[in-house]
Design a protein with these regions (language model features):
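Long, low-complexity or tandemly repetitive, helically biased scaffold regions used
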Residues: 2-136
Length: 136
């Protein structure tokens, strides 16, 4: 094993914790969006719904990562779902940011969405690296 490689057991722990962090951070940011004033109701609702998707998908994958399977882990379906999650959330937050920026929302809110997207994509990239190391 190389110095930076992780084991499957470590992946399960790390990925489970990362999904929890993504969930908590997104939930906190979603609450902040609810308090935004000065943007349209439609724009605010789009941001909230986008974040809700992240919450639901992250929670599902957290549970699937930490679940104990009779036939063992990892299973093909998990890796397929993880790939879909990674592909979706490496682009979705940037698309949301670009959409809101094109609506010319307040610079403060635009910066907020930029850092939300950057944080989420950085986490997803880290998760993708871990998964590629342990994928059997």
């Amino acid at each position: 094993m190389k110095l930076n490689e992780i084991t499957l057991s470590q992946y399960i722990t790390y990925a489970g914790n990362l999904f929890k962090c993504i969930f908590k951070r997104t939930a906190i940011l979603q609450k902040k969006v609810e308090g935004f004033s000065g943007i349209s109701t439609i724009a605010k609702q789009k941001i909230i719904e986008s974040m809700q998707e992240v919450l639901e998908d992250s929670q599902t994958l957290e549970l699937e990562t930490e679940m104990h399977y009779e036939e063992g882990f990892p299973h093909t379906t998990y890796w397929e779902e993880l790939k879909i999650y990674i592909d979706k959330y490496k682009t979705q937050p940037w698309n949301l940011y670009a959409d809101m920026k094109s609506r010319r929302i307040n610079g403060l809110y635009s910066s907020f969405l930029y850092y939300y997207a950057k944080g989420l994509v950085d986490d997803i990239t880290l998760l993708e690296g871990w998964a590629s190391e342990v994928r059997i």
